[in-house]
Structure formats: C-alpha cells, structure tokens
C-alpha cells in the first residue's frame, strides 16, 4: 500500500494548531478544511490529463485538461464532512458520495448505517475523507462498500493516522493509497489516537 505522510510545513503548522486542547469549533473546522485541501493537492498529483484545444483571447490554444470521469469525494459521516469543503476547493465539479459508519464504543467495531453513491462510481476515482484513521474499521468498511459497487481506484485522505489503523488498512486493501498529515504514536485503551486530535467529530460539530 502506498503511504504518504505529507510533511509540507503548512500542513505540519496547521495540524499542530488543531492539537490545542482549547481550540474553538470555528477554528478547528477551518483548519480541518484547509489541511483537507492541501492533502487533496498532493493526492491528485498523478491524475491523467489530455490535450484539448480551446478558443483563447488571441485564437486557438492547446491546454491540459483532466481526463475521464474524474472524481467522487466520499466523506465518512459525520466527521468526514469537516474536510469536504477543502477537498472541493480543488475539485469543485467532483460528485459527492456519502457513507455513514459509526464505531461501537464498547466493541470498537464499525457499524455501517447509510450510503448513497454516485451512479457512475465504476468510472471514477474515489477520494475517501475522514479526519482520523484509528483502528481502521470504519475506513475498511467504507472501502469494502466502494469496491463492491465497482469503484476502480480509491485514495484515502486523513488528518491523523495510527500505526494500528495503517496496518489493518494495508492488510485489508493493499491496493489503496493513503495520504495523511501525520502518523501518530498509537491507540489508547479506548481506541483513540495518541496524541491525536481528540474527538474530531465533536470538535467539528461543536457537540461537546
């Protein structure tokens, strides 16, 4: 599995700000979107382009254009919504597919409860976005669903990943690509990433 820890200074700076215990909902939400945008820039660097001719101000001009059906953005509900605006800044025409998975707090196992995928998923690259890759269960369940629907290419964008989640994802889906702003130390006894960001969903939505 291709694993990319994006070490750009802007990414590291913004992620560092997100780790503050007293960060406001507004600021956390802004930074999640900004880091999501930067991760998207890196993750799409290998997209194929094709030459097309358009009418420019001085006559015909040849330009590069993204080839094919392009992309669907797949936020995992609910926390993935916090990164979606940043992704769409770079890909404003991307179609959106939504997957709902929550983690049972007692067993730490993923529980899928909703999905709505674009009809042309079998012709698109999927960018799956979720702030945290902890145990990997929710991400694996989402990718299982995408592959079952025929999605040919899947890339994962997360703010923070734990080694345990990376190992689980690589074992289940070695063909996907992972882009993360940080690989942290590991999980605590409750399955939270340490030092991590805390509960990203609660911080994005202001529910705690």
UniProtKB/Swiss-Prot annotation:
Its EC number is 2.4.2.9. One of its GO terms (biological process) is UMP salvage. Pathway: Pyrimidine metabolism; UMP biosynthesis via salvage pathway; UMP from uracil: step 1/1. InterPro entries: PRibTrfase_dom, PRTase-like, Upp_B, UPRTase/APRTase, Ura_phspho_trans. Allosterically activated by GTP. GO terms for molecular function: GTP binding; magnesium ion binding; uracil phosphoribosyltransferase activity. Binds 1 Mg(2+) ion per subunit. The magnesium is bound as Mg-PRPP. 5-phospho-alpha-D-ribose 1-diphosphate binds at residues 78, 103, 130-138, 199. Its cofactor is Mg(2+). Uracil binds at residues 193, 198-200. It catalyses: UMP + diphosphate = 5-phospho-alpha-D-ribose 1-diphosphate + uracil. Keywords: Allosteric enzyme, Glycosyltransferase, GTP-binding, Magnesium, Nucleotide-binding, Transferase. Catalyzes the conversion of uracil and 5-phospho-alpha-D-ribose 1-diphosphate (PRPP) to UMP and diphosphate. PANTHER family: ADENINE PHOSPHORIBOSYLTRANSFERASE, URACIL PHOSPHORIBOSYLTRANSFERASE, CHLOROPLASTIC. Belongs to the UPRTase family. This is Uracil phosphoribosyltransferase. It comes from Sodalis glossinidius (strain morsitans).
